[in-house]
């Protein structure tokens, strides 16, 4: 391939990220890709970036040589730039307004385990950021009977497998990956069976361990990006645009920012504008650092050396004054002069302010370590219809706890703090203990949300049970003839529960609606019990101005005297909590009550209970 000169560049290299569930092989795949590149021994073309690895087109073509008869292609992109750190937390920082800096993604799925929680979360964030992806169906070497052919293209290795092994591969591809993509609304198929890649997600079986299928993975990635993303990959000579991946200390030079440049040119001395915790940061590039060219992979510590300029797409470390204020996930723009810097600063300020949430409404408090993770948290919460009162970048501080207390006043279930990958300051911890505010912390978004949702459900259920316990349930009893043990003060009688339930503390009324007292105690065969249900015969004591023979008689039927508000709740919020016989008794109670008050337990203008 002709050497890519700066002036003659037509397309820049696509930026590729690797996502997937923990232990599905993301890091192994990246290591394999880097190792393959070094092993290809292309002098001068093996370039490492800060936080990224570049695989030149010539290496891809060399690897894919055996495939040319099956998949003919010619590369016009310079190669592929892989972001070194896998996972969707870092991917979240590759943000740009309306999408992502990443041009393409590899979703790594263990073909034997299939989709796991982080697989779904990865797809969710790819959808949110509108990033196209292919699936690397990893660990084919773990399929029973698979005979490994190291560093061989998948299609060639497949021909060397037994028929039953091929069939097992097909079954696992379908059951664990392709069918799951269909369930999520994606058409998908094995890459070599696809005619229209714009409509179908390509699934490439690989082994990151043995290197099988890596040739196809790189060839498909390169082919798809240059064919469908040319408009996005056009090289621009103008001022650079990028995004901060990470802020770090550079020994001897102070604070530095690891940045992915996705457009234009960045030069030493340029004015750059980025986003900080307390507003936009305008500064000058003091130094640009890139790793020295590698002779072999896995060098313990890569040395960085200064360079004068960097062209997109690239990973570079920028040293500049004031970067200690900058935050990961913030955009980076090069300004031509101070006037343009002020305009860009306003643009950055608006972009970051749009992410921060500050309201007086009910909702959870969100703190995250970077703008990217904050954005991902907000999107994930909104998708789950969880309201947000306050969201910002930085550690959990005392003021966040005060916000949570204010939110709890409006809704007790939302007075909590969700802290993603950030510290909780000691004074915040103290304040939280003082006010009983729960702080959820985790460095995996889906686990953080899972923990909160579990807690939320438990709290709502506990509150519901508490409310339920306060309600008088429908109950109907008959005084058993011959079982009057005491006529008054309190009256003690034997009763049969005809329907519903009775409990101590429940008021009782006659069939004419007149209240006659309250159940004080219930006994069954001499033992005190807390409730009696339909079909039971028990002894009850009744407190109040009631005398057997004057106010009630043997054989009388009594009902629990349900307050109107309780009846409304039984007919609406807690209807599903009533048994069939309780519902029958409730209708009878409502009928009795309506003779005295026709509006009793009328809900939304419609009488409830006469014929519910």
From Swiss-Prot:
Quote the function comment for this protein.
Answer: Function in general translation initiation by promoting the binding of the formylmethionine-tRNA to ribosomes. Seems to function along with eIF-2.
Which Gene3D superfamilies has this protein been placed in?
Answer: P-loop containing nucleotide triphosphate hydrolases, Translation factors, Translation initiation factor IF- 2, domain 3
Output a single Gene Ontology CC term carried by this record: cytoplasm
Q: What is the scientific name of the source organism?
A: Hyperthermus butylicus (strain DSM 5456 / JCM 9403 / PLM1-5)
- Where is region (G5) located? 207-209
Coiled-coil regions listed in the entry = none
Show the SUPFAM superfamilies listed in the entry.
Initiation factor IF2/eIF5b, domain 3, P-loop containing nucleoside triphosphate hydrolases, Translation proteins
A Pfam family cross-referenced in the UniProt record is GTP_EFTU_D4
Name the segments for region: G2. Answer: 45-49
Record key words, sorted: GTP-binding, Initiation factor, Nucleotide-binding, Protein biosynthesis
| Residue segments, region G3 | 84-87
Superkingdom assignment: Archaea
- PANTHER family membership: EUKARYOTIC TRANSLATION INITIATION FACTOR 5B, TRANSLATION INITIATION FACTOR IF-2-RELATED
Protein name, please? Probable translation initiation factor IF-2
Q: Where is this region: G4?
A: 138-141
Asked whether the keyword Protein biosynthesis is assigned, the reply is yes
Q: Which residues form the tr-type G domain?
A: 11-229
Cite the residue spans of the region called G1. Answer: 20-27
Q: Which family does it belong to?
A: Belongs to the TRAFAC class translation factor GTPase superfamily. Classic translation factor GTPase family. IF-2 subfamily.
So where does GTP get bound? 20-27, 84-88, 138-141
Q: Which GO terms describe its molecular function?
A: GTP binding; GTPase activity; translation initiation factor activity
């Amino acid at each position: 391939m002709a050497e890519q000169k700066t002036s003659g560049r037509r397309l820049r290299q696509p930026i590729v990220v690797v996502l997937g569930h923990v232990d599905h092989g993301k890091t192994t795949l990246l290591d394999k890709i880097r190792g393959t590149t070094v092993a290809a021994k292309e002098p001068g073309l093996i370039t490492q970036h800060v936080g990224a690895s570049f695989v030149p087109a010539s290496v891809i073509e060399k690897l894919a040589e055996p495939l040319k008869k099956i998949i003919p292609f010619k590369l016009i992109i310079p190669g592929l730039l892989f972001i070194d750190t896998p996972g969707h937390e870092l991917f979240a920082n590759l943000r740009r307004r309306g999408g992502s800096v990443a041009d393409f993604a590899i979703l790594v799925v263990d073909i034997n385990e299939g989709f796991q929680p982080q697989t779904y979360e990865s797809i969710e964030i790819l959808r949110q950021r509108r990033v196209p992806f292919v699936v690397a169906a990893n660990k084919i070497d773990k399929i029973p009977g698979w005979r490994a052919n190291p560093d061989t293209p998948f299609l060639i290795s497949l021909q060397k497998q037994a028929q039953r092994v091929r069939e097992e591969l097909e079954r696992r591809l379908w059951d664990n990956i392709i069918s799951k993509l269909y369930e999520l609304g994606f058409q998908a198929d094995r890459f070599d069976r696809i005619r229209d890649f714009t409509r179908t997600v390509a699934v490439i079986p690989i082994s990151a361990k043995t290197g099988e299928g890596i040739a196809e993975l790189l060839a498909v990635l390169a082919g798809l990006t240059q064919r469908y993303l040319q408009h996005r990959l056009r090289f621009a000579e103008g001022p650079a645009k990028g995004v901060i991946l990470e802020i770090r200390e550079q020994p001897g030079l102070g604070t530095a920012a690891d940045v992915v440049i996705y457009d234009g040119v960045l030069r030493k001395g340029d004015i750059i504008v980025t986003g900080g915790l307390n507003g936009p940061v305008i500064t000058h590039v003091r130094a640009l650092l890139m790793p020295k060219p590698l002779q072999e992979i896995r060098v313990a510590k890569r040395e960085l050396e200064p360079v004068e300029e960097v062209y997109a797409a690239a990973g570079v470390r920028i040293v500049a004054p004031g970067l200690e204020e900058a935050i990961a996930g913030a955009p980076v723009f090069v300004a031509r002069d101070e006037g343009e810097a002020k305009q860009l600063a306003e643009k950055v300020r608006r972009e970051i302010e749009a992410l921060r949430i500050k309201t007086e409404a009910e909702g959870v408090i969100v703190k995250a370590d970077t703008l990217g993770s904050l954005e991902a948290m907000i999107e994930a919460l909104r998708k789950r219809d969880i309201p947000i009162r306050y969201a910002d970048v930085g550690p959990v501080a005392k003021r966040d706890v005060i916000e949570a207390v204010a939110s709890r006043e409006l809704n007790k279930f939302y007075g909590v703090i969700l802290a993603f990958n950030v510290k909780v300051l000691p004074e915040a911890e103290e304040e939280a203990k003082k006010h009983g505010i729960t702080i959820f912390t985790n460095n995996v978004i889906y686990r953080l949300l899972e923990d909160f949702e579990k807690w939320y459900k438990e709290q709502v259920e506990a509150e519901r049970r508490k409310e339920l316990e306060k309600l008088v349930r429908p109950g109907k009893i008959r005084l058993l003839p011959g079982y009057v043990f005491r006529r008054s003060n309190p009256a003690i009688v034997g009763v049969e529960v005809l329907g519903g339930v009775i409990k101590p503390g429940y008021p009782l009324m006659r069939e004419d609606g007149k209240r006659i007292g309250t159940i004080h105690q219930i006994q069954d065969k001499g033992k005190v019990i807390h409730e009696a249900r339909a079909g039971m015969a028990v002894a009850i004591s009744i407190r109040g101005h009631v005398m057997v023979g004057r106010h009630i008689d043997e054989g009388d039927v009594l009902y629990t005297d349900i307050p109107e508000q309780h009846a409304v709740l039984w007919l609406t919020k807690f209807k599903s909590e009533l048994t069939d016989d309780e519902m029958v008794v409730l209708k009878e109670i409502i009928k009795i009550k309506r003779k005295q008050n026709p509006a009793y337990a009328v809900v939304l203008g419609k009488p409830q209970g006469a014929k519910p």
